[in-house]
């Protein structure tokens, strides 16, 4: 169907978002038309403001509107542990847990030879610099995703960091709470067995 040009551009803009297909984009566009003008302006300003004002922390690479970020500036956090994650969304997920009190380092991706992404394309060099400059760091927790790219990234970082003498650990992967053993794949079961702990 042919939409007026302004609606067509709005629909096309919505389809650029992850998980938004053409039908959802049309619904969203028409929802915007039904919104109060003040709400639309607030929404538009929020988009522009987020894009303009949010930057990456120069210490850890997490998204922030101040530099360094609030986590890096927090003197109550454990300076001796750095949790390495792929994405700022991973930091947010870890923070929701409210158990980890160390610092973070965001890679902004994972090694993926199939997609042409190597170690030089992610935030590895600043991690090495950070570890060299901060002698108080005693442990690096590798919390990359449990997929091929995340595993490749963890293995690479593990080999790279071992000679530094800093303890390198990997998050345990295993069975989800409420999940049934019979539905778990072999890799998940194997990791759950390896990551078992004393009770």
From Swiss-Prot:
Matches recorded under PROSITE patterns: RECR, TOPRIM
Protein name per the record: Recombination protein RecR
SMART domains, A to Z: TOPRIM (SM00493)
GO molecular function: DNA binding; zinc ion binding
Domain Toprim: 80-176
PANTHER family in the record: RECOMBINATION PROTEIN RECR (PTHR30446:SF0)
Its biological purpose: May play a role in DNA repair. It seems to be involved in an RecBC-independent recombinational process of DNA repair. It may act with RecF and RecO.
Membrane-spanning segments: none
Superkingdom as given in the UniProt entry: Bacteria
Keywords from the named record: DNA damage, DNA recombination, DNA repair, Metal-binding, Zinc, Zinc-finger
Family: Belongs to the RecR family.
GO annotation, biological process: DNA recombination; DNA repair
Name of the gene: recR
Entry-linked HAMAP family: RecR
Residue ranges covered by zinc fingers (C4-type): 57-72
A UniProt-annotated Pfam family: Toprim_4
CDD domains assigned to the protein according to its UniProt record, in alphabetical order: TOPRIM_recR
Keyword hit for Metal-binding: yes
InterPro entries xref list: DNA_Rcmb_RecR, Rcmb_RecR, Rcmb_RecR_Znf, TOPRIM_dom, TOPRIM_RecR
SUPFAM superfamilies, per database record: Recombination protein RecR
């Amino acid at each position: 169907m042919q939409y007026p040009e302004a609606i067509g551009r709005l629909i096309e803009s919505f389809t650029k978002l992850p998980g938004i297909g053409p039908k959802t984009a049309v619904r969203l566009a028409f929802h915007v038309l039904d919104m109060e003008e003040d709400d639309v302006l607030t929404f538009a300003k929020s988009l522009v403001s987020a894009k303009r004002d949010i930057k990456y922390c120069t210490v850890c690479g997490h998204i922030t509107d101040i530099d360094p970020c609030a986590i890096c500036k927090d003197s109550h956090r454990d300076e001796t542990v750095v949790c390495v994650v792929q994405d700022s969304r991973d930091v947010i997920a870890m923070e929701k847990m409210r158990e980890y009190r160390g610092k973070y380092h965001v890679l902004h991706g994972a090694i993926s030879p199939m997609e042409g992404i190597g170690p030089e394309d992610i935030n590895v060099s600043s991690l090495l610099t950070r570890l060299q400059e901060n002698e108080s760091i005693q442990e690096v927790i590798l919390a990359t995703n449990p997929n091929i790219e995340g595993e490749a990234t963890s293995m690479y970082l593990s080999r790279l960091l071992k000679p530094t003498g800093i303890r390198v650990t990997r998050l345990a992967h295993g069975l989800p709470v409420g999940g049934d053993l019979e539905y778990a794949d072999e890799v998940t079961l194997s990791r759950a067995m390896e990551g078992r702990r004393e009770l």
